[in-house]
Amino acid sequence: MAKKALVNKANKKPKFKVRGYTRCQRCGRPHAVFRKFGLCRICLREMAHAGELPGVQKSSW
């Protein structure tokens, strides 16, 4: 889990737009966040396997 202070800091509107960054809405992780879902790769994978994301399927080839 991310530090609560950093999660709260990321939720504030930055003084300059370029200073803003995305964090996972579920766990607060700052890296590898998919903007479309607002989730990091780990949470996205867990939720997709559990069937909690509509329209997302595990691919196999």
Curated annotation (Swiss-Prot):
Top-level division of the source organism's lineage: Bacteria
Co-factor binding details: Binds 1 zinc ion per subunit.
Known cofactor(s): Zn(2+)
UniProt cross-references to InterPro entries, sorted A to Z: Ribosomal_uS14 (IPR001209), Ribosomal_uS14_bact (IPR023053), Ribosomal_uS14_CS (IPR018271), Ribosomal_uS14_sf (IPR043140)
Biological processes per GO annotation: translation
Positions bound to Zn(2+): C24, C27, C40, C43
A cellular component term, taken from the record's GO annotations: small ribosomal subunit
Keyword annotations of the record: Metal-binding, Ribonucleoprotein, Ribosomal protein, RNA-binding, rRNA-binding, Zinc
GO molecular function: rRNA binding; structural constituent of ribosome; zinc ion binding
Protein family: Belongs to the universal ribosomal protein uS14 family. Zinc-binding uS14 subfamily.
Role this protein plays: Binds 16S rRNA, required for the assembly of 30S particles and may also be responsible for determining the conformation of the 16S rRNA at the A site.
Assembly and binders: Part of the 30S ribosomal subunit. Contacts proteins S3 and S10.
Name the record gives this protein: Small ribosomal subunit protein uS14
Organism, scientific name: Mycobacterium sp. (strain KMS)
